[in-house]
């Protein structure tokens, strides 16, 4: 009998333990008027949020291609990493749905793929209405991996009034698949996807330049948005990242660019995101948001 009671108590304690962790993550249902559908956005709150009235800065963390809003919480080997980062830096983290292959721009052809508007307007408005956030650009940063890295750089360049900084890990900085180190069939599938969303490319040498991070370097120079991006030596996106780095050097845009060992995979991004949050903390502190 004692053994049964002990086991029951153990499971009860375990349940309380896991509930404590689960309580730190909300999942918002965000209505997108522009796309006429509801999209999910997990929100990771620091423990201190429950006590007090202070306002918190927010990092919007975008997932990659063929991913979903679940990725940042389910694919890291340390399932509590985002909770730890939220607590360590006293930051709210939001990991929204971004579509499977949207690349986070507003498609002129597909009304169901308007993710620039969703991320930069509808999502931000919902988060600001729901939580005690710093409702100003000085309290918002956008970042992401792969397709999400493209989204972070693209959206921040076009909406400097919303974000004070942007971060990218292995970002798709150029939509020209000839620069990607990928199999031919994968490149072909992405070319078809871009044609579906944007129409046939007008320039086959540098297609869809206005929808690429590398095509927005003049905006990046004019904007007061702090930039950090990194890529692994063996990453399939190393060439576009080096391209963006060289363009920003040429036009004199301040930025931090890092190359280190790694590939286009979660172990690299799990390591990279911890370094990026150090950068984000520095930016928020300089803004008076932390």
Language model region names:
Residues 2-10:
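Sec-dependent signal peptide recognition
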Residues 10, 20-21:
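Cleavable N-terminal signal peptides
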Residues 10-14, 284:
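Short, linear, compositionally biased motifs with a strong N-terminal bias
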Residues 22-290:
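Non-catalytic cap/lid and distal C-terminal segments of serine-dependent acyl enzymes
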């Amino acid at each position: 009998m004692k053994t049964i009671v002990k086991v029951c108590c153990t499971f009860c304690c375990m349940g309380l333990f896991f509930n404590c962790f689960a309580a730190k993550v909300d999942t918002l249902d965000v209505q997108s008027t522009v796309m006429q559908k509801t999209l999910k956005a997990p929100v990771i709150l620091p423990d201190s949020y429950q006590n007090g009235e202070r306002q918190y800065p927010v990092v919007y963390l975008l997932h990659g291609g063929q991913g979903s809003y679940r990725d940042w919480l389910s694919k890291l080997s340390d399932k509590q990493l985002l909770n730890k980062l939220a607590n360590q830096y006293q930051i709210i983290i939001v990991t929204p749905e971004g579509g499977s292959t949207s690349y986070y721009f507003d498609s002129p052809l597909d009304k169901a793929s308007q993710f620039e508007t969703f991320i930069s307007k509808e999502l931000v408005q919902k988060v600001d209405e729901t939580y005690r956030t710093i409702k100003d650009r000085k309290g918002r940063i956008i970042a992401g991996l792969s397709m999400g890295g493209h989204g972070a750089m693209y959206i921040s360049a076009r909406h400097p009034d919303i974000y004070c900084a942007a971060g990218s890990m292995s970002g798709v900085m150029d939509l020209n698949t000839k620069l990607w180190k990928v199999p031919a069939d994968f490149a072909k599938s992405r070319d078809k996807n871009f044609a579906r969303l944007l129409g046939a490319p007008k320039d086959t040498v540098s297609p869809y330049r206005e929808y690429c991070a590398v095509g927005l370097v003049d905006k990046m120079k004019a904007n007061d948005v702090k930039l950090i991006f990194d890529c692994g030596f063996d990453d399939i996106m190393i060439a576009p990242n080096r391209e963006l780095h060289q363009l920003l050097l040429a036009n004199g845009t301040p930025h931090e660019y890092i190359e280190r060992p790694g590939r286009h995979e979660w172990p690299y991004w799990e390591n990279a995101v911890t370094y990026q949050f150090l950068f984000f903390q520095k930016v928020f502190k300089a803004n008076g948001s932390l």
